[in-house]
Amino acid sequence: FVKNSGICETTPGVNQYSGYLSVGSNMNMWFWFFEARNNPQQAPLAAWFNGGPGCSSMIGLFQENGPCHFVNGDSTPSLNENSWNNYANMIYIDQPIGVGFSYGTDDVTSTVTAAPYVWNLLQAFYAQRPEYESRDFAIFTESYGGHYGPEFASYIEQQNAAIKAGSVTGQNVNIVALGVNNGWIDSTIQEKAYIDFSYNNSYQQIIDSSTRDSLLDAYNNQCLPALQQCSQSGSTSDCTNADSVCYQNIEGPISSSGDFDVYDIREPSNDPYPPKTYSTYLSDPTVVKAIGARTNYQECPNGPYNKFASTGDNPRSFLSTLSSVVQSGINVLVWAGDADWICNWLGNYEVANAVDFPGNAQFSALDLAPYTVNGVEKGQFKTVDNFSFLKVYGAGHEVPYYQPDTALQAFKQIIQKKPISST
């Protein structure tokens, strides 16, 4: 890999590394690592994963929370003052193989089969940079990360236990936090939330009451039974069926019922934001060479996505996995921008209220309170013990793009093992 390519992070004295680590035979997983801008010797380590399934984490790096971003259609990036490496050593990872700059053999067909390769990457990273082995570690992710985040965290905890018991050889990963924004976690809750959110949200009514009634009928008589069958049998055929039944009856009809961006309902479907400029930049041969990439950048290639679809991974619930991660005691944040449709805040809120942990009764009974950043109300939140929910005002799917200061504050609080709180 390449040290200090001069691309993206231009803060003097802040080191960066980009390149590949082997996670299996002919499996070259791309990572881009940035030291913390402040106190890198003590700062925690945080990994960022975009969703998809099969989308590159370079999206997050360049559009959301990385050291540089593209402003107003500029063709070259400028420094991002709200970068998450202000407070953490950040590693952005392209997974599974075939996504982004990662290349080689891809045998990942589901969230569960993706997890071991992510663990392999962390082990390979520690072998190269042993000074990070003892650091606090956090996973932050969005969208399909509602599947990835809970499963990756849970797998790491299982591996830690196996290492302690002597049945697995490897380095303990000191996981302390998980953050999932606008996540797809539980289809039973979130398919219904499409209907409720589309009828009643802060920005625009997408469906009228008679459409809502017919969609609720379709949910109860078509989508829900299919999801229950997937959940009960766990079979590929039942789960792929649930995926298509719910799409045909709920998501498809609503998303085609008006001209809106499913990632930001304030905008029309041809919304140019967040700008795609970064992907043009990452196809520049000079840039590719400088960072040590060996393949053409693919933002969200079809191949990996289709493998997940073929096993019916999407409608499989990760609510119980999320619950077990909260029960393990690590600091967990479920958060969402309030203008996103596809993984809307309402579905995320109802998932959060359903998380099974000792504080659930207290948590689900709590009303949301104002969340302020330097005295300005930027959203609403609630927190009990090690579990928090945050709704962010004026933000689409990629929250840090729309509300960078709010996102940075929430990130900082969670990685420092604190409940989120107003400032």
From Swiss-Prot:
Its EC number is 3.4.16.6. One of its GO terms (cellular component) is fungal-type vacuole. GO terms for biological process: antibiotic biosynthetic process; monocarboxylic acid biosynthetic process; proteolysis. The keyword Methyltransferase does not apply. Substrate binds at residues 343, 398. It comes from Penicillium janthinellum. Belongs to the peptidase S10 family. The keyword Repeat does not apply. Keywords: Carboxypeptidase, Disulfide bond, Glycoprotein, Hydrolase, Protease. This is Carboxypeptidase S1. It comes from the Eukaryota. The active site is at residues 143, 340, 397.
